[in-house]
Regions:
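Active-site gating loops and adjacent loop-to-helix segments of metal-dependent hydrolytic enzymes
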Residues: 77-108, 159-171, 229-259, 332-351
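Divalent metal-coordination and catalytic microenvironments
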Residues: 11, 29, 34, 57, ...
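N-terminal metal-binding scaffold of metallo-dependent hydrolase/deaminase domains
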Residues: 1-47, 59
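Metal-coordinating catalytic core of metallo-dependent amide/deamination hydrolases
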Residues: 138-268
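Alpha-helical scaffold segments that flank or form the walls of functional sites
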Residues: 77-148, 173-187
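His/Asp/Glu-enriched, well-ordered alpha-helical/loop segment
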Residues: 11, 252-258, 303-391
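C-terminal cap of metal-dependent C-N hydrolases
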Residues: 14-17, 379-425
Length: 425
């Protein structure tokens, strides 16, 4: 029998919509050739002969997607949390990322990162590497072995780095990127390349033009940063005086959605014009609440993005953020939305559990296609959660149990994990 065809039994939770959970207690979740074939109160006769794993009353949720994190920064999580973004980059990030020129260091660091990602509730991720091609290929190889599905980027930066962390020229950066794409495009089953200009201050116009040509040639998605910090936004205005807002620094090179699937991390201080263009172009926003708090960047208006119909998912933004768990990001998103409502705009209601859960599952997962839900035809990404380590004498509803896991869980609560129908944990 096909090993990617099976049934899971338990308390099944997934999003019916942005604002509504579907919960089936003692339900059957069918995986057929790696895709969801339905959720049932009683197992249909046509699936009767399929192997079934009974998880009792444990919760079964869709796999989570981390839309934005920096793998090389995992080594120095929780360091420099008293600094703002630009000082933090120069003090911690750039010196540490320069170490990945050493492939032995890269192997050691990325093996720890990959193992912790495997133990997390995340099944998909969009990840920044460094500008070093050998180290980035090591990262891709390590992640591929875990079974997690990921997009990994070789970072481009030809200006405003450091002597140890900056490419020689736009041409050198582009040439290295093309060779890396050729080497990795079909090399790994689970991990694919994604174009990754670090952010506008790190990339000259010449480099952006070349990356645009590469994107059109290989039809790759793209990830970068947008409107995270006031100092960063002012710097972009100095570097790109002819742009009306930060996003135009990307869109002028056709690297802002449309025919170029795009993730922009943060979007904390996006202008009305920038938001309108993101919506028009279908840009995905990676909301990174923990990082935006740690680096004092501000509070992204996630409520506005949801209400106006923009694509938005969640990101851990390691190492601005400290936890790889997107369950933690859900809790953080709810908490900071309450501060935004109370301190900034009383018309922007706080996020609900249902909305944060959607953002962490289908909201971000849809960047990978039909991912992040148990509706028929979706890729079968699932996480089984056991909340027995969080005891209570209370009789809790499945939604209450899910909310407690969002706020209180760690990797000890993960019983099993499936990606595209394959059990990886």
């Amino acid at each position: 029998m096909n090993e990617r065809t099976f049934v899971l039994k338990g308390t099944i939770c997934y999003s019916n919509s942005l604002t509504e959970l579907s919960i089936t207690e003692n339900g059957y979740l069918v995986c057929e050739d790696g895709r969801c074939a339905g959720v049932f109160d009683e197992l249909p006769e046509k699936f009767a002969g399929i192997s079934c794993t009974d998880f009792g009353d444990e919760l079964i949720i869709p796999g989570l997607t981390d839309l934005h994190l920096h793998a090389p920064q995992y080594t120095f999580r929780a360091s420099g949390m008293d600094l703002e973004l630009l000082d933090w980059l120069n003090t911690y990030t750039f010196p540490q990322e320069a170490r990945y020129e050493n492939t032995e260091f890269a192997k050691e660091a990325y093996s720890v990162f990959a193992e912790d990602m495997k133990k997390s509730p995340n099944t998909r991720a969009c990840i920044f590497g460094t500008l070093h091609v050998p180290a980035t290929e090591i990262l891709m190889e390590q992640l591929d072995k875990t079974g997690i599905k990921a997009m990994v980027g070789k970072v481009n930066m030809d200006r405003n780095g450091s002597p140890q962390l900056q490419e020689e020229s736009a041409q050198a950066s582009a040439d290295a990127t093309v060779q890396w794409i050729k080497d990795t495009l079909d090399k790994f089953e689970n991990v694919k390349p994604i174009l990754t200009p670090r952010f506008t201050p790190s990339c000259s116009d010449e480099l952006m033009e070349k990356l645009s040509e590469i994107q059109k040639r290989y039809h790759l998605p793209m990830q970068s940063h947008l409107s995270e910090n006031f100092g960063e936004i002012a710097w972009v205005k100095e570097l790109c005086p002819n742009t009306h807002f930060y996003g135009e620094a990307y869109s002028q090179f056709d690297l802002f959605g449309g025919d170029c699937p795009t993730i922009m991390a943060h979007c904390v201080h996006s202008s009305d014009e920038e938001i309108a263009l993101m919506k028009k172009q279908g840009v995905y926003i990676a909301h990174c609440p923990q990082s935006n708090t740690n680096l004092a960047s501000g509070i992204s208006p996630a409520r506005r993005y949801l209400d106006e119909g923009l694509h938005i998912g969640l990101g851990s933004d390691i190492a601005g953020g400290t936890s790889v768990s997107i369950l933690r990001a859900m809790a953080d998103a709810i908490q900071v939305s309450k501060l935004y409502w109370r301190l900034v705009d009383l018309s922007m209601k706080p996020l609900t559990v249902e909305e944060a859960f959607y953002m962490g599952t289908e909201g971000g997962g849809s960047f990978f296609g039909k991912v992040g839900n148990f509706k028929e035809g979706y890729e079968f990404d699932a996480v089984v959660l056991n909340d027995s380590t969080i005891p209570t004498p209370l009789k809790l509803s499945p939604k209450d149990r899910l909310e407690r896991l969002i706020y209180l869980s760690d990797d000890r609560n993960i019983t099993a994990k499936y990606v595209a129908g394959r059990k990886i944990l």
